[in-house]
Amino acid sequence: MQCPHCHRETVVKNGTRRLQDEQVVQYYRCRDCHRNFNERTGTPMARLRTPSRVVELALKNRSEGMGARATGRVFDQSHTTILQWEARLAEHADAWSPPAPAGREVTLEGDEVYTRVGENLPAADSEGWTLTFFERESRYWVTALAGQKDEELFKQGTETTWNWAQGADFIRWFTDGERRYGQALWPLASEYLPERGLAISYPYRKVWREGLEVAMKIKGSQGKPRVEWVKVDHPFTAISPSSEVHANHNEAHNAALRRRCSAYRRRQNLYAKAKTALQRTLDVQ
């Protein structure tokens, strides 16, 4: 074990302490910096006086669709305490994100979901848009960013998702009819082909990275869906059948999100009051 303060391994045990829920916490002392800490230091449970079982059940109820004030009434806590527990957990969300599996194929589905934030503004001016990316095979929720539906939101969401997936050898990037996904991904994942060793019949020089396929499914205003590949694919990248280009799993996940997260529930006064609060509820889902 390393010391969380000086990051050295000269650590010895320094007694135990029994908490209110009868849980025993081990304490340690560093011989170099002479500072004491316990096994909870640096975790969401650090310096928490409430029994861990109560915190676990409260956050589980929040992730199953119960509002913050209702959760506080059930567990005899203030709603601000519930929100502080969520903020603690959201701060450590990045540490629990596994990287994309190297040497395997990754299929990403991108979509947006809308909810009200603060005042009841038009959808174009609201900060309640949430950009989500979903890995098809593992059902892993890669990215969830809340904000106004503009180029900055698509840029941040695309960059976060690409940083997670770029380690995989084969990436399939499927979205809905929104073209700003491809526009944000093009500067990150495009490359120039060498002039030598390329067939004359292939007229393009700037293409997607080898192994990356970017396509979107357009539903169409007349009920005639079609599939469109974005930009130019690498000549050595395999193309998927049109039937596999969709974001159905992500759309189903967004529908389930409206049941599991109270801030996304329609026709109920449970919306988030600010964008930061909406992002916090997304991080703990």
Positions of PLM-derived features:
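Residue-level recognition of single "structural anchor" positions
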Residues: 1-285
